[in-house]
Curated annotation (Swiss-Prot):
One Pfam family recorded for the sequence: HIT
GO MF assignments: catalytic activity
Gene Ontology process terms (BP): nucleotide metabolic process
Highest taxon of the lineage: Bacteria
Protein name: Uncharacterized HIT-like protein BB_0379
Amino acid sequence: MYDCIFCKIINKELPSYKVYEDDLVLAFLDINPLTVGHTLVIPKEHSESLLNMDDKFNERVLKVCKKISNALKRINSSIYGGINIYSALGAGAGQEVFHTHFHVIPRFKNDGFGFKRGNKLNLEVEKFKELSMQISMNI
């Protein structure tokens, strides 16, 4: 058994504000939301990140993210412009709970949350070619 807060929620050892559950996936409201309606979607089987999650969960987790997104848009007409869906993979990317999870974050006008793009890297064409080849060869 993992000493994992999300596993404890799955096993009903800790409470949650559940919005969806099926045999593979659980979705519940984030108790430290970035915006109103911020929801977490998790596989019921423990894995530390998307990179080592069993493939049988991939399709289901994304389908549930879509269901939650559509539900949020139906119940809140003030959602402005869209919804962010993301997963941080590793501490360097901001992952704090090491159980695979996706954030479904409704966006509101002037909500103060967002991904800010920094300076452009200004890579040369050859560097783009080299990088695309390296990635392709490692898939």
